[in-house]
Amino acid sequence: MKMYVAGQWIDKPRKIEVLNPYDSSVIDTVPKADAADVDRALASAERGAKVMARLAGYERWKILKKAAELMAERNEALGQLISREEGKIIAEGRFEASRAVETIMGSAEEAKRIHGETVPLDGAPGGVGKLGFTLRVPCGVVAAISPFNFPLNLVCHKVGPALAAGNAVVVKPATDTPLSALRLTEILLEAGLPPEGIQCLTGSGGEIGDLLCADRRVRKITFTGSRDVGERICRVAGLKKVTMELGSNSPVIVMPDADLDTVAAAVAATGYANAGQVCISTQRVLTTGKIY
């Protein structure tokens, strides 16, 4: 597949092979972006941010709602793609595709509900009978860096709200699983998203991720991944707004009166789903010696 930069699907001589984790077969290749591609993407996103900010909430709702409908129609194909590039079983791939539809539809609904606040000013002399008000406005350019374990839904978690709020988004999907993000980009454009409202850069996180996070044209960074990388991004980001969803060490606490059959089933399901590659998977069980 090609990456999407400055309103065009482009290819590059340098490639990254996308492998099926089951047998290491090559599913597809994607371009390996460089510094020049990052600069083009951000220049386009700056223009796109102005376009997106001018769209009414209703128009953003309409685009995202249409995208969710297209995703629902293609649920099986998306589920198959997730399974092939990430390695999860097909049932989990289909479930993720369905969750992604809900994520985009929820974002669409929120596009109609972005409002400010009215504040009485009578707490100060001369403020009697006066009101102040606030408005929520878009950040501008949002860099969305996603992990490998949920290659569609976690991209939607970042892209959907950002577009709903009137921002332009530069997506940097995980190097191992970029295809679902590229397919989502296709669907959003088909749904009517302005061409410069989204960019999708494929490549090495170390090579292009730092460039994205350090660039002053980026106003917000949203990242899901490891604690080490999250700390690095925060150091590079400077005064940008950041949202970090980092790895955890999730315990289950089993109390003496717990239903152990239910607990055992839940621990097995949450510990081994997606081969344990979930940030909130069960990693420890804390209980009393008797239950142990």
Regions found by a protein language model. Name each.
Residues 27-115:
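Glycine-rich loop-to-alpha-helix module at the N-terminal edge of alpha/beta enzyme cores
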Residues 131-132, 199-219:
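A structured beta-alpha segment of the ubiquitous adenosine-cofactor-binding alpha/beta core
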Residues 1-29, 62, 66, 114-143, ...:
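Terminal low-complexity tails and localization/encapsulation signals of metabolic enzymes
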Residues 228-292:
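ALDH superfamily catalytic-core signature
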Residues 24, 60, 82, 104, ...:
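Residue-level signal for inorganic ion chemistry
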Residues 160, 219-224:
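Periplasmic-binding protein-like
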Residues 159-160, 209, 230, 264:
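Generic hydrophobic/aromatic pocket-lining and core-packing "Φ" positions
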Residues 119-195:
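Conserved small-residue-rich beta-alpha loop and adjacent elements
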